[in-house]
């Protein structure tokens, strides 16, 4: 009885998982006629398009693995630099100069890792601290959309 109750409680969570289907992602992101054609999705993402849907983010995030720019085994020295700069920022009272330096370093790191929640969070913070609410919101939305895409694929322990 107890196992049945636990199963019934987790059933809605399992039903909502959006498992990435490799063949579909490849087909959709490589087809220039598809609404999920990768170059177009990436342009929308980079421009801060706030009309991107969960489905757009699904194909954007998982389609990145099939792009020439995807090099998961390469070290991202720009990420290391951005983290080092972030460690020098006084988050209670940041200077304009330190925030501009952080933004530049994070943008460099995002070239190699465009969906890093850590980098997007730093960027949202820096823009917010500078009073640039537009870019703060763009990067906050990007971060949350990427995290939601990852979460939608399952619980991290198994698919679905």
Locations of the language-model features?
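Canonical positions in the second alpha-helix
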Residues: 108-109, 143
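The tetratricopeptide repeat
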Residues: 118-119, 126
């Amino acid at each position: 009885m107890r196992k049945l109750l636990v199963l019934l409680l987790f059933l809605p969570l399992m039903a909502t998982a959006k498992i990435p289907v490799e063949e579909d992602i490849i087909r959709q992101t490589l087809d220039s006629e598809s609404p999920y054609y990768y170059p177009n999705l990436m342009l929308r993402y980079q421009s801060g398009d706030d009309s991107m849907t969960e489905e757009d983010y699904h194909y954007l995030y998982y389609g990145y693995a099939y792009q020439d720019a995807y090099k998961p085994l390469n070290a991202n020295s720009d990420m290391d630099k951005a983290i080092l700069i972030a460690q020098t920022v006084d988050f209670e009272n940041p200077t304009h100069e330190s925030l501009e330096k952080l933004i530049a370093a994070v943008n460099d790191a995002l070239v190699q890792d465009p969906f890093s929640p850590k980098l997007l969070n730093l960027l949202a913070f820096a823009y917010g601290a500078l009073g640039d609410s537009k870019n703060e919101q763009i990067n906050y939305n990007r971060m949350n959309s990427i995290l939601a895409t990852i979460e939608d694929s399952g619980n991290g322990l198994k698919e679905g």
